[in-house]
């Protein structure tokens, strides 16, 4: 008989995830259908989103050549029925206070910083770059982890050294770029550009660096259509940039600068977001989402 969710002690809530303790060494990592944008948790949810994020992470954890935090399969008997398909049993780690961002292309906050200073996280970039310019080599551009509701801040490598020490900072940079390259190369064979992504790492009791949280999901990554890529233009995407674009467009009526909660998403935006997430999973994995645990039709 599977345990009930109430059998586990709730430890923490994030923008999208809930964390529960199973025992002294294992946690239950639950992905909800919540969606966040611009440091707000939206009132609207995206049906099946938690399952899509979980399915995508499981696929990439299996693909990537790096130790990860999984401690059981997605149908592990320790996972309660009510969260089956959107929860994972993971190892408890000492999490590191760095968002490890890898960028293959210039966009988002990186483009904003570049336009202001010509640099990104302490790295001097060549002149003449524009929206969606591809870097000669992927860049490691870390950020500090912010409290819930606050914004992560881009930092340079020296600041990472201050946070975790020189040896661990160098290891984070190397591992981040290795994982990004492997995942982005795979996605490109499926017609998808992973423009950038973020990883989180922890350390196990032996001191080994372990990939944790989520990996290459549409929440943590920018997914672009490879056949539609055009430098100098905002790219059509599979990820939650679609939601951000609606929120900052005239139809939403939302004034981001006023620091008011975003409005509910219209049904068509909810449906289109769900469809984009599913399409990203199916194209990248080659699997049918309908066959994932508990997926709705």
UniProtKB/Swiss-Prot annotation:
PROSITE patterns recorded: SAICAR_SYNTHETASE_1 (PS01057), SAICAR_SYNTHETASE_2 (PS01058)
Gene Ontology BP terms: 'de novo' IMP biosynthetic process
Class of enzymatic activity (EC top level): ligase
Entry-linked CDD domains: SAICAR_synt_Sc (cd01414)
Organism superkingdom: Bacteria
Documented EC number(s): 6.3.2.6
HAMAP family associated with the record: SAICAR_synth (MF_00137)
Name used for this protein in its record: Phosphoribosylaminoimidazole-succinocarboxamide synthase
Organism expressing this protein natively: Mycobacterium sp. (strain KMS)
The gene coding this protein: purC
